[in-house]
Protein backbone atom coordinates (compact mmCIF):
# COMPACT_ATOMS: atom_id res chain seq x y z
CA UNK A 1 0.00 0.00 0.00
CA UNK A 2 1.22 3.50 -0.82
CA UNK A 3 0.61 5.83 2.12
CA UNK A 4 1.67 9.06 0.40
CA UNK A 5 -0.92 11.77 0.87
CA UNK A 6 -2.63 10.12 3.84
CA UNK A 7 -3.13 12.00 7.10
CA UNK A 8 -2.21 9.93 10.17
CA UNK A 9 -3.39 10.84 13.67
CA UNK A 10 -0.99 9.85 16.46
CA UNK A 11 -1.55 8.95 20.13
CA UNK A 12 -1.49 12.65 21.08
CA UNK A 13 -4.09 13.55 18.42
CA UNK A 14 -1.48 15.33 16.29
CA UNK A 15 -1.77 14.86 12.55
CA UNK A 16 1.01 13.93 10.12
CA UNK A 17 0.76 14.26 6.36
CA UNK A 18 2.62 11.37 4.75
CA UNK A 19 5.07 12.30 1.99
CA UNK A 20 7.07 10.19 -0.50
CA UNK A 21 8.54 6.78 0.35
CA UNK A 22 12.27 7.11 1.13
CA UNK A 23 13.17 3.68 2.48
CA UNK A 24 11.94 0.12 2.78
CA UNK A 25 13.35 -2.79 4.77
CA UNK A 26 12.48 -5.92 6.66
CA UNK A 27 10.83 -3.97 9.45
CA UNK A 28 8.63 -1.43 7.73
CA UNK A 29 8.52 1.34 5.14
CA UNK A 30 9.72 4.89 5.84
CA UNK A 31 8.05 8.01 4.48
CA UNK A 32 8.75 11.71 4.82
CA UNK A 33 6.20 13.86 6.64
CA UNK A 34 5.06 17.47 6.53
CA UNK A 35 7.68 18.17 9.25
CA UNK A 36 11.17 17.82 7.75
CA UNK A 37 12.62 16.85 11.15
CA UNK A 38 10.67 13.58 11.27
CA UNK A 39 9.77 10.53 9.23
CA UNK A 40 7.01 7.99 9.70
CA UNK A 41 7.72 4.26 9.79
CA UNK A 42 4.77 2.03 8.91
CA UNK A 43 4.08 -1.70 8.76
CA UNK A 44 1.08 -4.02 9.18
CA UNK A 45 0.14 -4.33 12.85
CA UNK A 46 0.15 -8.13 12.57
CA UNK A 47 3.90 -8.21 11.83
CA UNK A 48 4.78 -7.28 15.40
CA UNK A 49 8.25 -5.83 14.92
CA UNK A 50 7.09 -2.20 15.12
CA UNK A 51 5.37 -3.02 18.41
CA UNK A 52 8.74 -4.30 19.65
CA UNK A 53 10.29 -1.01 18.53
CA UNK A 54 7.51 1.04 20.11
CA UNK A 55 7.95 -0.75 23.43
CA UNK A 56 11.72 -0.19 23.33
CA UNK A 57 11.26 3.51 22.58
CA UNK A 58 8.76 4.06 25.38
CA UNK A 59 10.49 1.93 28.04
CA UNK A 60 14.15 2.65 27.36
CA UNK A 61 14.82 5.54 24.99
CA UNK A 62 13.78 8.39 27.23
CA UNK A 63 15.87 11.54 26.61
CA UNK A 64 16.36 12.16 30.34
CA UNK A 65 17.67 8.62 30.88
CA UNK A 66 20.08 8.88 27.96
CA UNK A 67 21.39 12.28 29.13
CA UNK A 68 21.92 11.06 32.69
CA UNK A 69 23.76 7.98 31.44
CA UNK A 70 26.03 10.10 29.21
CA UNK A 71 26.97 12.29 32.16
CA UNK A 72 27.62 9.38 34.52
CA UNK A 73 29.80 7.59 31.94
CA UNK A 74 31.51 10.72 30.58
CA UNK A 75 30.41 9.84 27.05
CA UNK A 76 29.45 12.67 24.71
CA UNK A 77 27.13 10.85 22.33
CA UNK A 78 24.84 7.82 22.45
CA UNK A 79 23.62 6.96 18.96
CA UNK A 80 20.00 6.12 19.67
CA UNK A 81 17.02 8.07 18.40
CA UNK A 82 13.79 8.80 20.24
CA UNK A 83 10.18 8.38 19.18
CA UNK A 84 8.08 11.52 18.73
CA UNK A 85 4.73 9.73 18.53
CA UNK A 86 3.01 6.51 17.47
CA UNK A 87 -0.41 5.30 16.42
CA UNK A 88 -2.57 2.97 14.35
CA UNK A 89 -4.17 3.38 10.94
CA UNK A 90 -6.88 1.12 9.59
CA UNK A 91 -7.44 0.64 5.87
CA UNK A 92 -10.27 -1.41 4.43
CA UNK A 93 -8.70 -4.80 5.16
CA UNK A 94 -5.49 -4.21 7.13
CA UNK A 95 -4.59 -2.35 10.31
CA UNK A 96 -1.18 -0.66 10.35
CA UNK A 97 1.08 0.54 13.14
CA UNK A 98 3.20 3.66 12.67
CA UNK A 99 5.98 5.45 14.52
CA UNK A 100 7.07 9.05 14.08
CA UNK A 101 10.83 9.22 14.57
CA UNK A 102 13.76 11.57 13.95
CA UNK A 103 14.76 12.07 10.34
CA UNK A 104 18.42 11.25 9.73
CA UNK A 105 20.83 11.33 6.80
CA UNK A 106 22.52 8.65 4.68
CA UNK A 107 23.26 5.23 6.11
CA UNK A 108 26.77 3.88 6.57
CA UNK A 109 26.23 1.23 3.90
CA UNK A 110 25.77 3.96 1.27
CA UNK A 111 28.90 5.74 2.52
CA UNK A 112 30.96 2.55 2.30
CA UNK A 113 29.71 1.75 -1.21
CA UNK A 114 30.58 5.29 -2.31
CA UNK A 115 34.13 4.66 -1.04
CA UNK A 116 34.76 1.52 -3.10
CA UNK A 117 33.49 -0.76 -0.29
CA UNK A 118 36.36 0.12 2.01
CA UNK A 119 36.98 2.62 4.81
CA UNK A 120 40.32 3.64 6.37
CA UNK A 121 41.21 1.79 9.56
CA UNK A 122 41.00 4.99 11.60
CA UNK A 123 37.42 5.58 10.45
CA UNK A 124 36.42 1.98 11.17
CA UNK A 125 37.85 2.15 14.69
CA UNK A 126 36.06 5.45 15.40
CA UNK A 127 32.77 4.03 14.14
CA UNK A 128 33.37 0.91 16.23
CA UNK A 129 33.83 3.03 19.35
CA UNK A 130 30.62 4.97 18.64
CA UNK A 131 28.63 1.76 18.25
CA UNK A 132 30.31 0.26 21.33
CA UNK A 133 29.21 3.28 23.38
CA UNK A 134 25.69 2.93 22.04
CA UNK A 135 25.28 -0.77 22.73
CA UNK A 136 26.82 -0.34 26.19
CA UNK A 137 23.90 1.97 27.02
CA UNK A 138 21.45 -0.60 25.63
CA UNK A 139 23.10 -3.43 27.52
CA UNK A 140 23.02 -1.54 30.80
CA UNK A 141 19.27 -1.16 30.31
CA UNK A 142 19.06 -4.93 29.84
CA UNK A 143 18.61 -5.01 26.05
CA UNK A 144 20.65 -6.24 23.08
CA UNK A 145 20.23 -4.80 19.57
CA UNK A 146 20.47 -8.03 17.60
CA UNK A 147 20.93 -6.57 14.11
CA UNK A 148 24.02 -4.35 13.96
CA UNK A 149 25.06 -3.69 10.34
CA UNK A 150 26.05 -0.77 8.13
CA UNK A 151 22.53 -0.21 6.78
CA UNK A 152 21.27 0.18 10.38
CA UNK A 153 23.88 2.83 11.20
CA UNK A 154 22.81 6.27 10.01
CA UNK A 155 24.50 9.66 9.89
CA UNK A 156 23.01 12.75 11.47
CA UNK A 157 21.41 15.08 8.90
CA UNK A 158 23.61 18.01 9.97
CA UNK A 159 26.58 16.72 11.98
CA UNK A 160 28.05 13.94 9.83
CA UNK A 161 30.35 12.90 12.68
CA UNK A 162 27.35 11.71 14.70
CA UNK A 163 26.13 8.19 14.05
CA UNK A 164 22.92 6.49 15.14
CA UNK A 165 22.17 2.79 15.49
CA UNK A 166 18.58 2.37 14.31
CA UNK A 167 15.96 -0.32 13.65
CA UNK A 168 14.95 -1.84 16.97
CA UNK A 169 12.68 -4.57 15.63
CA UNK A 170 14.99 -7.35 16.88
CA UNK A 171 15.93 -5.94 20.29
CA UNK A 172 15.91 -8.59 23.02
CA UNK A 173 15.51 -8.17 26.74
CA UNK A 174 18.26 -10.36 28.18
CA UNK A 175 18.04 -8.96 31.74
CA UNK A 176 14.92 -8.75 33.88
CA UNK A 177 14.89 -7.54 37.48
CA UNK A 178 18.66 -7.96 37.62
CA UNK A 179 18.54 -11.57 36.40
CA UNK A 180 19.99 -12.73 33.09
CA UNK A 181 17.75 -14.83 30.86
CA UNK A 182 18.65 -18.54 31.05
CA UNK A 183 20.80 -20.24 28.43
CA UNK A 184 17.86 -22.04 26.81
CA UNK A 185 17.38 -22.56 23.09
CA UNK A 186 14.22 -21.45 21.32
CA UNK A 187 13.93 -23.10 17.89
CA UNK A 188 11.61 -20.30 16.75
CA UNK A 189 14.39 -17.74 17.32
CA UNK A 190 17.13 -19.53 15.36
CA UNK A 191 19.10 -17.45 12.82
CA UNK A 192 17.40 -14.15 13.71
CA UNK A 193 19.02 -11.04 12.26
CA UNK A 194 21.04 -10.51 9.10
CA UNK A 195 22.58 -13.88 8.26
CA UNK A 196 26.08 -12.64 7.43
CA UNK A 197 26.40 -10.88 10.81
CA UNK A 198 24.17 -13.04 13.04
CA UNK A 199 26.02 -14.07 16.22
CA UNK A 200 26.55 -17.77 16.84
CA UNK A 201 24.22 -17.75 19.86
CA UNK A 202 21.38 -16.51 17.66
CA UNK A 203 22.06 -19.18 15.04
CA UNK A 204 21.46 -21.73 17.80
CA UNK A 205 18.26 -20.12 19.04
CA UNK A 206 19.54 -18.37 22.16
CA UNK A 207 18.52 -14.82 23.06
CA UNK A 208 21.24 -12.41 21.91
CA UNK A 209 23.20 -11.33 24.98
CA UNK A 210 25.98 -8.76 25.32
CA UNK A 211 28.61 -10.96 23.72
CA UNK A 212 26.38 -11.47 20.67
CA UNK A 213 26.22 -7.76 19.86
CA UNK A 214 29.99 -7.45 20.32
CA UNK A 215 30.55 -10.46 18.05
CA UNK A 216 28.40 -8.91 15.33
CA UNK A 217 30.27 -5.61 15.61
CA UNK A 218 33.53 -7.50 15.05
CA UNK A 219 32.22 -9.06 11.84
CA UNK A 220 31.01 -5.64 10.69
CA UNK A 221 34.38 -3.97 11.27
CA UNK A 222 36.08 -6.61 9.12
CA UNK A 223 33.64 -5.84 6.31
CA UNK A 224 34.02 -2.06 6.71
CA UNK A 225 37.77 -2.47 6.23
CA UNK A 226 37.02 -4.06 2.86
CA UNK A 227 37.22 -7.67 3.99
CA UNK A 228 35.12 -10.57 2.74
CA UNK A 229 34.13 -12.94 5.54
CA UNK A 230 34.56 -16.68 4.85
CA UNK A 231 30.77 -17.08 4.99
CA UNK A 232 29.77 -13.93 3.05
CA UNK A 233 28.99 -15.75 -0.20
CA UNK A 234 27.36 -18.64 1.66
CA UNK A 235 25.05 -16.11 3.33
CA UNK A 236 23.70 -15.15 -0.08
CA UNK A 237 22.44 -18.75 -0.52
CA UNK A 238 20.50 -18.52 2.79
CA UNK A 239 22.12 -21.75 4.01
CA UNK A 240 21.84 -20.89 7.71
CA UNK A 241 23.32 -24.13 9.01
CA UNK A 242 26.44 -23.84 6.83
CA UNK A 243 26.92 -20.16 7.75
CA UNK A 244 26.69 -21.07 11.44
CA UNK A 245 29.11 -23.97 11.08
CA UNK A 246 31.60 -21.81 9.18
CA UNK A 247 31.53 -19.12 11.87
CA UNK A 248 32.04 -21.78 14.53
CA UNK A 249 35.23 -22.97 12.78
CA UNK A 250 36.90 -19.61 13.39
CA UNK A 251 35.90 -19.05 17.05
CA UNK A 252 39.28 -20.16 18.36
CA UNK A 253 41.30 -19.01 15.37
CA UNK A 254 40.86 -15.26 15.04
CA UNK A 255 44.14 -14.75 13.19
CA UNK A 256 43.04 -17.14 10.45
CA UNK A 257 39.66 -15.41 10.23
CA UNK A 258 41.36 -12.05 9.69
CA UNK A 259 43.93 -13.38 7.23
CA UNK A 260 41.21 -15.15 5.23
CA UNK A 261 38.98 -12.07 5.22
CA UNK A 262 41.51 -9.24 4.86
CA UNK A 263 44.82 -10.90 3.89
CA UNK A 264 46.30 -9.28 6.99
CA UNK A 265 45.49 -9.29 10.70
CA UNK A 266 45.02 -5.82 12.23
CA UNK A 267 46.27 -5.98 15.81
CA UNK A 268 43.23 -4.15 17.15
CA UNK A 269 40.71 -6.52 15.57
CA UNK A 270 42.78 -9.53 16.59
CA UNK A 271 42.62 -8.39 20.22
CA UNK A 272 38.99 -7.28 20.02
CA UNK A 273 37.60 -10.48 18.48
CA UNK A 274 39.76 -12.73 20.68
CA UNK A 275 38.40 -10.97 23.77
CA UNK A 276 34.81 -11.26 22.52
CA UNK A 277 35.28 -14.99 21.97
CA UNK A 278 36.49 -15.37 25.57
CA UNK A 279 33.24 -13.98 27.01
CA UNK A 280 30.65 -16.30 28.52
CA UNK A 281 26.99 -15.96 27.61
CA UNK A 282 26.16 -14.26 30.92
CA UNK A 283 29.30 -12.15 31.31
CA UNK A 284 29.31 -8.36 31.47
CA UNK A 285 32.05 -7.13 29.10
CA UNK A 286 34.76 -4.70 30.13
CA UNK A 287 33.65 -1.96 27.74
CA UNK A 288 36.52 0.32 28.73
CA UNK A 289 39.00 -2.35 27.68
CA UNK A 290 37.25 -2.83 24.34
CA UNK A 291 37.27 0.94 23.82
CA UNK A 292 40.98 1.08 24.62
CA UNK A 293 41.72 -1.64 22.06
CA UNK A 294 39.83 0.17 19.30
CA UNK A 295 41.31 3.53 20.26
CA UNK A 296 44.78 2.12 19.58
CA UNK A 297 43.72 1.77 15.94
CA UNK A 298 42.76 5.43 15.79
CA UNK A 299 46.24 6.69 16.63
CA UNK A 300 48.55 3.95 15.34
Curated annotation (Swiss-Prot):
It catalyses: L-seryl-[protein] + ATP = O-phospho-L-seryl-[protein] + ADP + H(+); L-threonyl-[protein] + ATP = O-phospho-L-threonyl-[protein] + ADP + H(+). Autophosphorylated. It is found in: Virion; Host cytoplasm. Its cofactor is Mg(2+). Residues 16-282 form the Protein kinase domain. Induction: Expressed in the early phase of the viral replicative cycle. The active site is at 147 (proton acceptor). Its EC number is 2.7.11.1. The keyword Transcription does not apply. Essential serine/threonine-protein kinase that plays different role in the viral life cycle. Phosphorylates the host small ribosomal protein RACK1 thereby customizing the ribosomes to a state optimal for viral mRNAs (which contain poly-A leaders) but not for host mRNAs. Facilitates viral DNA replication by inhibiting host BANF1, a cellular host defense responsive to foreign DNA. Phosphorylates host BANF1 on serine and threonine residues; this leads to BANF1 relocalization to the cytoplasm, loss of dimerization and impaired DNA binding activity. This is B1 kinase. It comes from Vaccinia virus (strain Ankara) (VACV). The lineage of its organism: Viruses, Varidnaviria, Bamfordvirae, Nucleocytoviricota, Pokkesviricetes.
